[in-house]
Amino acid sequence: MNAKVISIYAADTSGVCSALYELGGMTVVHDASGCNSTYATHDEPRWYDRKSMIYISALTEADAVMGNDGKFIRDVAKAAGELSPKFIAICGSPMPAMTGFDYSSAAEEIERETGLTTFFVDTNGTHSYLQGAEGAFLNIAKLFCCEGKEKQANSVNIIGATPLDFSVNTSVSSIKKWL
């Protein structure tokens, strides 16, 4: 049997993390460890020279089975209090997807506790990084690109330029020079 589709090299969670990396927010992947460790060790070259607030929730089997959503909410709120991000983004992996974790409610509760804009990007760790990045960028546009905001003269947004597509670290600076 021949494969008709070649699987993509990075998951939707990597797309979210890559899209939001430089925006000053805190991104939390709700997972035991697998999704974020692959992203951190293979997909993201910016770790070498730039800090970011991308974390894993360290979901345990017991928390997943027993539905200990409060621990996730408390941990994210506590970290946000210590780190002072501009916003909070949460995304998911296979285990919380299988147990039916309610990301919308968790995001609302985290926002209520922290006072920070909090949103979730609908991921489950099994789709393409393109879907994750798209979801992240759409959330940012809906929440932060408002009518009536003053436009910066002679400026342009370079949306979607992440190392997942532009792997050479100088690619984005080359795009900026060209513009």
For each feature predicted by the language model, list its residue ranges.
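An N-terminal assembly and electron-transfer interface module characteristic of large anaerobic redox
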Residues: 1-179
